[in-house]
A protein has these predicted regions:
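Terminal accessory/targeting
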Residues: 9-14, 272
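Cofactor-binding active-site loop characterized by glycine-rich and histidine/acidic residues
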Residues: 48
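A glycine-/small-polar-enriched, mobile loop at the entrance of the PLP active site in fold-type I
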Residues: 12, 41-43, 243
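Alpha/beta enzyme core
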Residues: 1, 18-40, 44, 52-66, ...
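Short catalytic/ligand-gating loop segments at beta-alpha or beta-beta junctions
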Residues: 167, 199-202
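Short, small-residue-biased leader/transition segments that mark boundaries at the very start
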Residues: 3-5
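Short catalytic-loop micro-motif centered on adjacent basic/acidic residues
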Residues: 12-16, 71-72, 94-95, 196-199, ...
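C-terminal alpha-helical cap/extension of soluble enzyme domains
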Residues: 205-272
């Protein structure tokens, strides 16, 4: 199925969700558009939401959904965190060792793959470093683009199931127009057999997203834009009761998720 996604030029949306409104909103969107999706939690949200409790709502809604919904742990920083994620319903993980030197990244991902594949859990890795600086120009100064020939070696040696690439994308809000290196996406796609993942996609323009998918991106992570949609709804409904505000947030998240599903060409794919 991974090969079909690569060859068919669409991308599966990955939505970070850390509260009921976001979770329900993206599942509403997936159901309405008959779209397979990935829903995801990560360490950055544990200060807001108890993962060990919220995971059961994620799992319950994923199981009830009439479209495929994968439960993913985003940017796993260490072994303990990933094991906890898998002990609490997650059926897909990302081990982000991209800040480590190359050989250490290889060794760490191989270790994860060897362990998690025994439980039938796919492992996403990152090669190159996207970083987390708030100013785009500063982020690029510290940036490590993915090296296509290294990517080939990396995927072959680790056995990772998908690969997050660094191609001019950064996390959070872009302070300047992002410059996506489509040439790198194409070269990496030629060199490796696994789906490629684009992180930090919220601020990237629609045309660039479509082009990235044509070049080989098969999974796209969205978080900031869901938050922006939620905030707009909160501002519009701020004089209403909290119950009404919550419903407005769920609807706004749904609408933004539907927009992304259509943009990525993922609508209707659940029924193929």
């Amino acid at each position: 199925s991974e090969m079909c996604i690569r060859d068919r030029h669409y991308a599966i949306p990955h939505f970070n969700v850390w509260n009921a409104e976001m979770l329900m909103g993206v599942i509403d969107a997936a159901e309405e558009l008959r779209a397979p999706i990935i829903i995801s939690f990560g360490t950055g949200f544990t200060g807001n939401t108890s993962f060990e409790d919220f995971c059961y709502m994620m799992e319950s809604m994923a199981k009830k959904a009439t479209v495929p919904v994968i439960l993913h742990w985003d940017h796993g920083r260490n072994w303990t965190i990933l094991k906890n994620a898998v002990d609490h319903c997650m059926n897909s993980v990302m081990r982000d060792a991209s800040a480590l030197p190359y050989e250490e990244n290889v060794a760490e991902i191989k270790r994860c793959v060897d362990y998690f594949h025994a439980y039938n859990i796919p492992v996403e890795a990152e090669l190159g470093h996207v970083g987390n600086e708030t100013v785009y120009e500063e982020a690029l100064a510290e940036y490590a683009y993915t090296d296509p020939s290294q990517a080939k070696d990396f995927v072959e040696r680790t056995g990772c199931d998908s690969l997050a690439v660094a191609v001019g994308n950064v996390h959070g809000v872009y302070s300047a127009e992002p410059k996506i290196r489509f040439d790198i996406i194409e070269e990496v796609n030629k060199e490796v057999s696994v789906p490629l993942v684009l992180h930090g996609a919220s601020g990237i323009g629609d045309e660039d997203i479509k082009k990235a998918i044509q070049c080989g991106i098969a999974k796209i992570n969205i978080h900031t834009e869901l938050c922006q949609a939620a905030m707009e709804a909160i501002n519009e409904h701020k004089d209403e009761p909290f119950l009404a505000v919550e419903r407005a947030v769920r609807q706004a998240v749904k609408e933004r998720a539907m927009y992304k599903i259509k943009l990525f060409g993922d609508d209707g794919r659940a029924d193929e």
